[in-house]
Amino acid sequence: MSESEKYRIEVEAIAEFVPGQSDPDENRYVFAYHITLTNTGEVPAQLISRHWVITDGAGKVQEVRGLGVIGEQPMLAPGQQFSYSSGSVLETPVGTMQGSYQMAAEDGHRFDAEIPAFMLAMPRVLH
């Protein structure tokens, strides 16, 4: 068995614009995102920390690092899922988010679960 099969977390992200909290006249665009992590590997693994790279439509980059997600450091058994929602505020109506979760397997091995890039976009802005 290869290491990539033994230690694997799949990350799925869905984002949506939140018009009620946004104010385009003030360059404030609020987005909610919903994340699902699935342990598709063969050993239990705990989410230790996160690293986000958030890029707005003007190319401005913010990096966010911290322990856990929404105050939790969930342990995922093989086949188990963990979902959560959070948000991000941009100064432009479009942007992207990507990054990684730092994981610790039950056997002590540490690895990153990549968060594929996903789009943040106010409806009717992209054609």
From Swiss-Prot:
It comes from the Bacteria. Residues 3-127 form the ApaG domain. One of its GO terms (biological process) is error-free translesion synthesis. SUPFAM superfamilies: ApaG-like. Gene3D superfamilies: ApaG domain. InterPro entries: ApaG_domain, ApaG_sf, Uncharacterised_ApaG. PROSITE patterns: APAG. HAMAP family: ApaG. This is Protein ApaG. It comes from Aromatoleum aromaticum (strain DSM 19018 / LMG 30748 / EbN1). The gene is apaG.
